[in-house]
From Swiss-Prot:
It comes from Paenarthrobacter aurescens (strain TC1). Mg(2+) binds at residues 49, 253, 255, 289. This is 2-isopropylmalate synthase. Residues 456-579 are annotated as: Regulatory domain. NCBIfam families: leuA_yeast, PRK03739.1.
């Protein structure tokens, strides 16, 4: 087949391929052969990196609510601000410490640039904290060395070293606080690897990195510049060239400029990283920081404990939306409104069958569904494990088929329609959505079903020729049944008698004597719930004249439900003939 694409005409000559800017060569890379088997150390940066990207930065009350959410979820390292950059951030750090909001096993993290007055102010903010991470950074990229700082490699290294030495100096003022150091060569992805390692190793020496006194070396994709595999290669290269490796915690801080922040974090973790920084639902500058929700739940669905509690995803989302004053998109992985919703007919049918198979397999294994291995088509995770219901799993629009319609009827009303009845009713829904457009809600679906198959007694006279009243039967020794039925025919109350080998056959006899050409082709029934007092649902497929169609009946009596189903089919045929 010929490719008909044509050149875009866009100014591609203005952009340089990444490989022409930075060399990343790891021909003996090992990360592609690895799999994730345990969670990394997490650091949530919503209160600093996320907050600085908001149109309306968080108020102190919203900041505290976000901090409390992160603690509740299980994050043990939380970046809480840039206390030397604003009085607001300084005051919030003091509020957390003085207000006793920091659990003993949680380390707050604060950011600072490599300038003395900023570092001094940073340490002032930490007085009284049990433990803290001081995060020092300066930009090292080729571009920023040239256009921002006008410095060569040695000049940028001197800035970093001066900052590290000042941190050590002011650490002496915090005798009751355990300090862990973190250093970021900001814009790492735009920095030559050899130079990045030179700077990081020099900083690790100043901070006296060792197995007993580990230093966090954070390698941010401050701007995502290449494909995730390139980022992973750069992390593996650094993993091999940072010293002493046992004294280094390699941390990742991916952004999402190319839309692959999650993939970059996962591959970078495979490549030797120990820790990942990010934000809930991917908030952050430009296209955002890596999404901690997606990362954590990607591990969960592979059977790896993320060490973070996502079991009430809607509450997490509501809190994040309140604090950030930004909506979480409907398609945001795991947390969006539509991520567990299927509109497609084939998807709905597969999901319906998947639920049925899951129940069957769990019962065969002697386990509850909630404790059985989750395998349902199109649903990589059980919504219930995130605190969601199944209500939104299947929704009906013009793209939906019988599977989705049948699922909603069974899940919400315990009606298990035979397959051909599913096909028939999905056609009714299809005609409705084609004519009106939009989505059909669960309540609307049920109303359409009732109008089509289960009119109330008051409505029967309006569209149905026949109404079923009281019925009595007698069976002789040969098994033949005589039925006396009170019917409403064209609005007139009448009493009719019929004979047959059962209730349906006897009612058919009555209808035949009234001139109705009807034959029963198929019949099924089931209880609507467990217990002796449960109502029954009956489904009767009939040939009425030239039409083949279904009737449905619901009644506490199984016999009456089957008779109602037969009347339903006949009435539908009469209504269609009159339409």
């Amino acid at each position: 087949m010929r490719n008909a694409q044509k050149p875009s005409g866009m100014p591609i000559h203005r952009y340089l391929p990444f490989q022409d800017q930075i060399t990343v060569e790891v021909p003996d890379r090992t990360w592609p052969d690895k799999v994730i088997t345990k969670a990394p150390r997490w650091c949530a940066v919503d209160l600093r990196d996320g907050n600085q990207a908001l149109i309306d930065p968080m108020s102190p009350a919203r900041k505290l609510k976000m901090f409390q959410l992160l603690v509740k979820m299980g994050y043990k390292e939380i970046e809480v601000g840039f206390p030397s950059a604003s009085q607001t951030d300084f005051d919030f750090v003091r509020q957390l410490i003085e207000g006793g909001h920091i659990p003993d096993d949680v380390s707050i993290q604060v950011l600072t640039q490599a300038r003395e007055h900023l570092i001094e102010r940073t340490y002032e903010s930490l007085v009284g904290a049990k433990q803290a991470i001081v995060h020092l950074y300066n930009s090292t990229s080729v571009l920023q060395r040239r256009v921002v700082f006008n410095q060569d490699e040695d000049g940028i290294l001197d800035i970093a070293l001066q900052g590290a030495r000042l941190c050590k100096k002011y650490e002496e003022t915090l005798t009751d606080t355990h300090i862990t150091y973190e250093y970021s060569p900001e814009s790492f992805t735009g920095t030559e690897l050899e130079y990045a390692a030179r700077v990081c190793n020099a900083i690790a020496d100043v901070f006296e990195a060792s197995a007993d006194k580990q230093v966090i070396i954070n390698l941010p994709a401050t701007v995502e510049m290449a494909t995730p595999n390139v980022y992973a290669d750069s992390i593996e290269w650094m993993h091999r060239n940072l010293h002493p490796r046992e004294g280094i915690i390699i941390s990742l801080h991916p952004h999402n400029d190319r839309g692959t922040g999650v993939a970059a974090a996962e591959l970078g973790y495979l490549a030797g990283a120990d820790r990942i920084e990010g934000c809930l639902f991917g908030n952050g500058e430009r296209t955002g920081n890596v999404d901690l929700v997606t990362l954590g739940l990607n591990m969960f669905v592979q059977g790896v404990d993320p060490m973070i509690d996502f079991s009430d995803i809607d509450e997490i989302r509501r809190t994040v939306e309140y604090c950030n004053q930004l909506p979480v998109p409907e398609r945001s992985p795991y947390g969006g409104d539509l991520v567990f919703t299927a509109f497609s007919g084939s998807h709905q049918d597969a999901i319906k069958k998947g639920f049925e198979a899951l129940e069957k397999d769990a019962a065969a294994a002697g386990k509850s569904v909630d404790d059985f291995t989750w395998q349902v088509p199109y649903l990589p995770i059980d919504p219930k494990d995130l605190g969601r219901s199944y209500e939104a799993v299947i929704r009906v629009n013009s793209q939906s088929g019988k599977g989705g319609v049948a699922y909603l009827l069974k899940n919400e009303h315990n009606l298990d329609l035979p397959r051909r009845a599913q096909i028939e009713f999905s056609g009714v829904i299809q005609r409705r959505t084609d004519a009106v457009g939009g989505e059909v809600s669960g309540a609307q679906l049920w109303q359409i079903f009732q109008d089509e198959y289960l009119p109330s007694d008051e409505e029967q006279a309006q569209w149905g020729r026949y109404g079923l009243g009281s019925v009595s039967t007698e069976t002789d020794e040969s098994g033949a049944m005589t039925m006396n039925a009170n019917l409403r025919i064209d609005g007139v109350e009448v009493r009719r008698t019929g004979h047959g080998n059962g209730p349906i056959a006897a009612l058919l006899d009555i209808l035949h004597h009234d001139g109705v050409d009807v034959r029963v082709l198929d019949y099924s029934e089931h209880a609507l719930s467990e217990g002796g007092s449960a109502s029954a649902a009956a489904y009767v497929e009939c040939a009425v004249g030239e039409r083949v169609l279904w009737g449905v009946g619901i009644d506490p009596s199984t016999t009456t439900s089957s008779l109602k189903a037969l009347i339903s089919a006949v009435n539908r045929a009469v209504r269609d003939a009159q339409a």
